[in-house]
Amino acid sequence: MKKILVLLVILCLSVSVQAQVDLFNGQNLDGWEINGTEKWYVEKGELICESGPDAAYGYLSTKKHYDNFELELEFKQEADGNSGVFFRSTVAGTIVNGWQVEVAPPKLHTGGIYESYGRGWLIKPDPAKDQYLKMGSWNTMKIIANGNTVTTYLNGHEMVEIVDEKIGKGKGGIALQIHSGGGIKVKWRNIKLKELKYHIKSFLLIDIIKGMFLTLTY
């Protein structure tokens, strides 16, 4: 009976992960919207954001919304390199409401989570983890948002994990940010996302199976 129950749990979890899709096709900005006057363009298969004449905040947001997902991407910071990856966020002009995983120069909390126009910094990485950032080289970031829980990784190292009810209720898309101030240039590539479906149903089914197991053992 125990072996059967374990198999059922594994099957339940396996159907929750959908096929990985490319959010950036390496050729153009199809599927994305430019917000603000900063520069967003494609060059040699890379997505580039660069400060424009207004030196203001700018965002490139997905047209589609994503709730539960695993997002992987690569970024390379040139010049100042102050940027970020927003999730479950909505953008109107240069006003974004939602949550940002920080992408910043050394000692400025890359991998931490910030709530825009709300509570501000929710969690910052341990300063010792700053060593994992490779300024001026390609870095790999992974963000897993599943219900109330968000976990971030930088170059294979877990940076932070937070459980937050407000984040769990958030709705919106993915957005890349370029910070205000001018002199910023960041490159992006290999932006891939897997949607995580049936999050609640999966765990409810596991609870039911556990209940069945407890009933059968007494």
Language-model region placement:
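Sec-dependent N-terminal signal peptides
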Residues: 4-13
